[in-house]
């Protein structure tokens, strides 16, 4: 909401909010994944939600459209979050944001998304419209990319551009070893992948605020790219 209303940078707004909420590292990681996931897939989420919502998303009172996107993202992209939990948490968000009257709408729309997630509406016809929705990029940019690269290369570019970039960190061998650090980070809900060719380098995603991780606080790793 801060990004949409005030033009705030996602990283800064999320870090500030996580600092206020005092979440566990695991919950902060989940929160971060949801925030970035919703922003990266906004047009795709809008497309699916519009199929089950009787009102246009941009006509809903804020922050209802974002609550719907948050719920739909969890249902469609997060296997570890049960559908019923995503629905109930979204309904609760309506209440905590002073939109209790809309809780029935949110409940109904998200239940339909969950019921149909194996048979979702087809993407729009036409290469430009399809790619725009599938990868949540504006049509003007998709047109430009297709004219420069062709359909196949443009789609590959859009796919990569829409993936979250991992954070590269280096294990501090004076305080831990790679296996122990991997186990510790995964225990806190962080997605960890050892770098394919650089020893002691790990690629992290879904970290939330890095500074809340015990391993960061205790100096068991440093943020540094693989080339460093």
Q: Model-found features: residue ranges?
A:
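Class I Rossmann-like S-adenosyl-L-methionine
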Residues: 1-216
């Amino acid at each position: 909401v801060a990004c949409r209303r005030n033009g705030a940078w996602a990283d800064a707004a999320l870090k500030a909010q996580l600092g206020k909420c005092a979440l566990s590292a695991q919950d902060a990681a989940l929160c971060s994944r949801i925030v970035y996931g919703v922003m990266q897939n906004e047009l795709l989420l809008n497309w699916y939600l519009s199929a089950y919502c009787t009102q246009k998303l941009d006509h809903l009172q804020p922050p209802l459209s974002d609550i719907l996107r948050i719920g739909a993202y969890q249902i469609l992209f997060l296997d570890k979050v049960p559908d019923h939990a995503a629905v109930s948490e979204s309904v609760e968000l309506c209440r905590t944001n002073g939109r209790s009257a809309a809780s029935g709408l949110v409940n109904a729309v998200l239940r339909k998304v969950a019921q149909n997630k194996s048979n979702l509406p087809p993407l729009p016809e036409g290469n430009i419209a399809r790619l725009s929705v599938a990868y949540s990029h504006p049509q003007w940019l998709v047109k430009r990319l297709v004219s420069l690269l062709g359909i196949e290369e443009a789609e590959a570019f859009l796919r990569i551009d829409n993936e979250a970039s991992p954070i590269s960190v280096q294990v501090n061998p004076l305080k831990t070893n790679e296996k122990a650090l991997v186990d510790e980070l995964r225990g806190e809900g962080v997605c960890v992948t050892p770098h394919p060719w650089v020893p002691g380098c790990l690629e992290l995603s879904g970290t939330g605020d890095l500074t809340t991780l015990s391993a960061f606080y205790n100096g068991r790793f440093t943020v540094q790219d693989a080339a460093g």
